[in-house]
Amino acid sequence: MSHNAFITEETIEPTDDGPLDGVTVAVKDNISTDGVRTTCGSEMLADYVPPYDATVVERLRDAGATIVGKTNMDEFGMGTTTETSAFGPTENPAAEGRVPGGSSGGSAAAVAAGDADLALGSDTGGSVRCPAAFCGVVGIKPTYGLVSRYGLVAYANSLEQIGPLAPTVEEAAELLDVIAGVDERDGTTREPPAGQPTYADAADGDVDGLTVGIPTELVDGADEGVRETFDDAVETLESAGATTQEVSLPSVETAVQAYYVIAMSEASSNLARFDGVRYGASGDEDGNWNESFAAAREAGFGEEVKRRILLGTYALSAGYHDKYYKQAQDARAWVKQDFDEAFESVDVLASPTMPVPPFERGESLEDPLKMYLADANTVPVNLANLPAISVPAGETADGPVGLQLVGPAFGEATLIRAGSALN
């Protein structure tokens, strides 16, 4: 194992034979594994050992997969670089000296380095797609409700989904086939429309007649090298039979602001349970609960997590709820409306996954706003609860570039078909 991709290296054997016999899978360390610690990349949960498997872990093991460890991540999923982990930063196997993306950077690095055949990550605002792009692998963010979140340690419930990372589109699709489906323990899961092929069967590269929309707002601000690589990939789709047309999504100009208000607000609520009593390391302040809670959270949380909790609490506080949180939800509805209107004239939307190549290590920690703004192309998808895939599009001098394809709800098969034309 290499690149500090893993927090815990431990073999979890399969419980049955199935389509993933002999396949090794790395699991992000915010997904519960029975008897194996699940830290969320945080000192707060450094010794937490779940007494149960997440639904996706059960399905992996039932399908014959061997889990090889729990992967490094930005603390509680809050980051774009996998540098906020309490267990040290992960290195990018595909771009020396640069970050692997986040927050599922350990999962992407494990696949890129060959430490695991496949991996699971979670995507709240791009946390599967960003590291997939930066590490030159494939990552899928499923439609909200396609994959069970039971056993996922919550950051922002209304936004996040568990998704696969793999070297190829077909392998990512095979993993999605295993983990997708209704779960009675997660009331948000839904059945996709009947009559669809398996996701693996959809990876046939047939894009003849497919209409691809290019949102100008998600392309115009991209780094020059990223834009050139993206344009070349679009030409590949066109040569395979797809047609392209420009579309406009004016609402995405507000998406980053809306996303961070909503995500931080949900985080401030979800992370309230980590107080050293119910969950997390004790504050050891005898006789004074307030001081004990404060000491536990001061010692247990890193700076980025504290920042987001404070901002989220502020956005929900009396007198500011309507000014921030309600306006963010209104912006979210506008984003969804724009996507719905776009899909009336195109089958999928294409953009660079990330508008920039991989950051140099340490670069974004000095400027958190820069890290937030880098999510501009990915967060609108989570706000609209839509599926997306990041596929390697090529490389610049600074590292890999991903192409993101977005589809209507439960349109994963179409995304996989289009993505496989590039992969």
Swiss-Prot record:
Entry-linked InterPro entries: Amidase, Amidase_CS, Amidase_dom, AS_sf, GatA
UniProt catalytic activity: L-glutamyl-tRNA(Gln) + L-glutamine + ATP + H2O = L-glutaminyl-tRNA(Gln) + L-glutamate + ADP + phosphate + H(+)
Biased composition range(s): Acidic residues: 10-19
What lineage does UniProt assign to this protein's organism? Archaea, Methanobacteriati, Methanobacteriota, Stenosarchaea group, Halobacteria
Q: What is the annotated signal peptide range for this record? A: none
NCBIfam families hit by this protein: gatA
Point out the gene that encodes the protein. Answer: gatA
Please identify the protein, giving its name as recorded: Glutamyl-tRNA(Gln) amidotransferase subunit A
Q: Could you say which protein family the record assigns here?
A: Belongs to the amidase family. GatA subfamily.
Q: Which GO terms describe its biological process?
A: translation
Source species, please? Natronomonas pharaonis (strain ATCC 35678 / DSM 2160 / CIP 103997 / JCM 8858 / NBRC 14720 / NCIMB 2260 / Gabara)
- Per the record, GO CC terms? glutamyl-tRNA(Gln) amidotransferase complex
Q: Which HAMAP family match?
A: GatA (MF_00120)
Region feature (Disordered): 1-20, 75-108, 183-206
